[in-house]
Structures are given as C-alpha cells and as structure tokens.
Amino acid sequence: MDIEERINLIAQKPTEEILTIDRLKQYLEQGIDLNHYIGFEISGFVHLGTGIISMLKVRDFQKAKVKTTLFLADYHSWINKKLGGDLETIRKVAKGYFAEALKVSLKTVGGDPDEVKVVLGSELYEKLGIEYLENIIKISMNTTLNRIKKGITIMGRKQGESISFAQLLYVPMQVADIYSLNVNLAHGGIDQRKAHVIAIEVSDAFGYKPIAVHHHLLLGMHIDENIRQKLLEAKKTNNRELFEDSVIDIKMSKSKPETAIFIHDTPEDIRRKIRKAYCPIGEIELNPIIELVEYVIYPILKEPIVIENKKTHQTMEFDNVEQLKEAYAKKQIHPLDLKEYVAEKLIEILEPARKYFLEGKGNKYLEELKNLQITR
C-alpha cells in the first residue's frame, strides 16, 4: 500500500479534520510508524456514535497499517461523575461491558478486534508511576488556566458552567495520556479538538509533535428545528465556540436513551426510535436520518440505496449518498419512506452485536451493567 492510499484511508469519512495533513504525509514519507489512540469515558450503553462511528475510523486506521489502541479512561470517568461517580463500578464496566462493546462494534464494521490494544487508564498510570505525574506537570507548565477552562467542552460541559477543581485536571490528564502512551496519532470526535490542539502546542516539551484526527459526531434523534437553525448559524458565521457548545446538546448521547440507537437495541426499539426521529422534509443538512445513511449504513454496506414508496410500492435506487441527498432535497422521497429504509438497514447491520449481547457470551456483561445502573 502506497502513501497516498494510506492517507486516503485516514482522511475518508467519518474523518472531518486532520491536524495536519502535511505532518501526516511527512511522517509516512519518513517511514515513521503511526501509533494511534482513542479514549473513551466509561458510562452507559454504547450507541452508534461511540461504537460504530469511532470503530469505522479505527477500521480505516488498521487498513492503513496504523497500530491502534482503545483507551478506557476510568479516572477521567470518575472525575466527570459517570456511573454515579463510583470508581469501582467504572472499572468493572470498563473491563467488562465497555471493552466487549467496542470490540464487537469494531468487528461489526469490518475491523479486527484481535489487532487492537485495549488499555485501562489506571493500569497505565500504575505502570508509569511518577512519570505520568511529571507529564501532567509539563503540560500544565506549558499552557494557561484560561486554555484549560475553555477545554472543558471535551467533557461534555459548556463554557462558563460551574465545575470542580478535579474537572480542571481532566484536560491536562487527557493530553498526558497521549504522550504517556507514546501516541503520535491522537483520534477522537470533533468535540475532542481542544485537548488535541493543546497536545500539539505543548509538543516541544516531549520532543515530537502528534497528529490529530477528528471524526464526525453523529446527531441525536432529538434535534429540533430551533437547535438546527442555531447550529446552521454557527456554521455559517464560522463561530466555533457556539458550534462546540451546541454540539453538546445535539450529539447522540447515552444519557438520552430515546435519542440514541444502542448497538444491542432490539428491532422494535430501533424502529420506534427512528420513527420518532426528527427528519425535516427536503432538508439534508443536519438531518439525523440522512446522517445515518451517510455515516453508518452506506460506509458499512457499500451497496446501492433502495427506497420504497410505501403508498405506490415503487422504488428509487441510488448508487451513492449524494444521489440520495439530491432526490431528498427535491422532496422526491418522503421522510417516512427514508426512515423505513434506515431502520431496516440498522437492524441488519447491528445483528451481530445484538445477538452477542442479547443471546451470546456478552449477555452477562449487559446484564451486569443493567444491574449496576439499577442499584447505584
């Protein structure tokens, strides 16, 4: 595989941004091995954004001959009060349900779970000892309190929101994870951009400059026209601060279960959630149902998109997402017909994950998490 092919794999959807493409090319031309990581907070059930979108990108990295790592951030989750703020529970879920869910998701999208390294944060810190603390101090000495405060959006917190002092540690800890793992390719959703920019800015203290790759954040099913217009205005005026604050409200979130598709949802759950989802007729930008076709269904199935009109029983076939968008923008497709297609294809794609967690070996991990959520 040549350099151009590797770059194309890294840059293709769901990638939205590479910081920077020139540095990526330089590293590849120099024959530098790329060491990747993506970090995850440990909370509730894994949805399409966490499982499928993230793992689609990990799959691409694997194809591009990048060493991939999934980092289970138990201390970060504790700081951010996930799973009731119980560290023991967080670790149990991390090593059980969460690790399994990510591996199953990677396999579902065509990646190789046997070729990905899974690292628990606390185990890394125990191994590194004082070195990890030194990394945090180095980072803190090379950035400002104002930058750290602005970076709290990586935790799903809005700027100006009241936070604990521990939560201020979150950003330098995340940056320290990158250097502590010897990562030169940091990966995350576009909401993680601020931490990765700080990592690049403090790179002189560590002797090398990492690349950052940011993937698309999947919209939640609950977006409405008011939120949509706010986001469109932020994009139009290139107001990154407003956009990043708004993304917290509209991205698919496990804390709002009716707005998220989980990887082990039943067919009935998927159909119900898709049926209720926001899908404005003729609008293709910031439309969560269109996004599911563009970022989940088409990249995985790689097959023509066939939409059936339920009234006339006539079908329309599209070779790619752009053709579908064009027809939808012209109001040639009814939202209900598009929703029907999306629901059935998601049911098909998620069948392996659903069987693993509802009927197979993964059921014990799913039930364990359910019980922990009830008793905590």
Curated annotation (Swiss-Prot):
Binding residues for L-tyrosine: Y37, Y170, Q174, D177, Q192
Entry's EC annotation: 6.1.1.1
Residues reported to bind ATP: K254
Domain of life according to the entry: Archaea
Chain positions of motif 'KMSKS' region: 251-255
Subunit structure: Homodimer.
Identification of the protein by name: Tyrosine--tRNA ligase
